[in-house]
Amino acid sequence: MEPTYLLARGILKPWLATWFRWTLEGVERIPRTGGTILAFNHIAFLDPFAAAYLVDEVGRRVRFLAKSELFQDKRIAWIVRGAGQIEVRRGTREAPMALDHAYRALQEGELVAVFPEGTITDDPDLKPMAAKSGAARLALKTGAPLIPCALWGTQNIWPKAFRKHWWPPRQDIAIQVGEAMKVPVGDESRDAITDVSRRLSEELALLVAGLRPAIADRRRPRQVRAA
């Protein structure tokens, strides 16, 4: 592992483990070795930290597909780059390079984590948005297990519109790991990509719905200004 990854892990893991109350279900479904794709729903800024915590619990390191803005933020760019994360330059000609890097990582037996929605969901009830094609493309090309994982509780900590606090409150976080999806490995046709992406969205929605009763959504209701 890169020294920067080990440094970040050494700082963040104890904090995450002691500050939040975790419920992890289905962890045994994550392979301990070999190329693996974990696909998470995205409801808050804390989600990558929660995903990394889950992966570390099974003794693996994680490579995230991360938006380029994180690599340009001087406060964290040195960590993101030094920890070997994969930059996604969305909307540019270089965007496909991210999948090439992820493909090589999977071929080398690494675990790659993705947020297939591409950004934090805009749904007011935090339902997953439609998955973009990246996760499906990787699974179809490499044959690596594509495993949907649902996050819940992080929306009470660092939600999309948080303004009042930078230090996160103590809260419960739950993660449900689903079953690896069956995909037609080697079929990289548009129909196959569309079908796998659709099924991934459906699986994430079902997993999230199963977690919702466990942790109340404590976000403040959005204020509607009078006309």
Q: What name fits each language-model region?
A:
Residues 12, 82-89, 118-122:
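Short, basic, glycine/proline-bearing loop/turn elements
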Residues 22, 62, 112:
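Hydrophobic anchor at the start of a short beta-strand
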Residues 2-20, 81:
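Short hydrophobic helices that act as membrane-entry/anchoring signals
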Residues 3-4, 96-227:
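Non-catalytic C-terminal accessory region of glycerolipid acyltransferases
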Residues 17, 31-92:
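Catalytic core of membrane glycerolipid acyltransferases/transacylases, capturing the structured
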